[in-house]
Amino acid sequence: IGSHTVAIKTKTPQPIMPAMMGIMSITSPNTQEAKGERNPQGTGPYVFGKWTPGQSVTLKRFSGYWGSTPVVEDVMYVFRKESAVRAAMVKTGEADIAPNIAVQDATDPKMDFSYFNSETARLRIDMSQKPLDDIRLRKAMNLAIDLDALRGTIFAAGVVPQTQIVVPSINGHNPRLKPWPYNLAEAKKLVAAAKADGVDVGKEIVIIGRLGIYPNSTEAMEAMHAMLSEAGFNLKIKMMETAGWLNFLSRPYAEDRGPTLVQGQHDNNNGDAVFSMYNKYACEGAQSTTCDSQVEAGIKAATAATGDKRRDTWQEVQRRLHQDIVPDVQMFHMVGFSRVNPRIDFTPSIATNSQLQVSQVKFN
């Protein structure tokens, strides 16, 4: 329309367009061709300095930034896989902020912060593959997991058993749903009933884990492997780096993949369930293995609705998924831990696991 005006048209109604625009990055389409893949250009308060793959990234404050001038002039992101190492670097003054450290490393109340981080952990069940297309087995998996045994040990004591992919603060969360109880005897009965009907319950199921997806991620899969095995399932674990794991998480799925449970963690702090539901549970969702006509219709209706109707429609979709479809082994709404050097004025929040805005950081 003009040099500073853009017209946006959508194929379907988008009542929360302002919220959706708030998570979009703005980048020139000419950036990659002109500057290369490793010299990103954006509209933020910092400019890209240097990238040493697998080691570090540096940023410098942008003097021409259109907004308020941030306090921090230079930034270095250093990558260390081990939580204990990251925590120790802050303690010794080698680093200032270590986001997402493990619960066992958060031992200093003067430096460590605990907070709900908007992440929801689950195992996605590949419902398209036998024997996981049998709902009795999907229910049995949920009944076989002793969530209380995982809390305060492998996971932080403050994690909350989940009933849906979005946290309670998100519009569309259904507060009336109850977490699956731990009932090993009932889980075994469901497995036995499926076996009696000719379901191949002994077929090997592969747990696809991602290294470092959250603290103690490997230990979590090992514990859940033991619990599911006790219920009568035949499983093995494959822990992968992110690139290999993504081949199982997102389309296109390999036709010969077999039955899998994919370790996942989903972050939605954008205020509405729409940012989660299509991708995870629609028939054509990028990470969906389910296709239910009622869920599909509900997602479409809720996306176009406003007010109470929008909330209520999302809540019914959540109910059907939780009670009638069972596409996940449900785990927790997660708690994060971050360590902050006392010289830094910064309080981690629900957003810290997915982004750390240096413009918010000040010095004491």
Predicted features along the sequence, with ranges:
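Gly/Pro-rich hinge or "lid" segments in bacterial periplasmic/extracellular proteins
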Residues: 3, 14-74, 82-85
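Detector for C-terminal structural segments
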Residues: 52, 144-172, 215-225, 250-364
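Structural transition elements
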Residues: 132, 161-194, 211-220
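Extracellular/periplasmic solute-recognition and catalytic clefts
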Residues: 49-60, 76-129, 152, 159
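Short, well-ordered beta-strand elements
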Residues: 6-8, 44-47, 57-58, 73-78, ...
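A structural "hinge/loop" feature
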Residues: 13-26, 43, 124, 339-357
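Short helices/loops that flank or line small-molecule/ion binding pockets
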Residues: 83-94, 135-136, 222-231, 244-258
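A bilobed periplasmic-binding-protein/Venus flytrap-type ligand-binding module shared by bacterial periplasmic
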Residues: 60-63, 115-140, 144, 153, ...
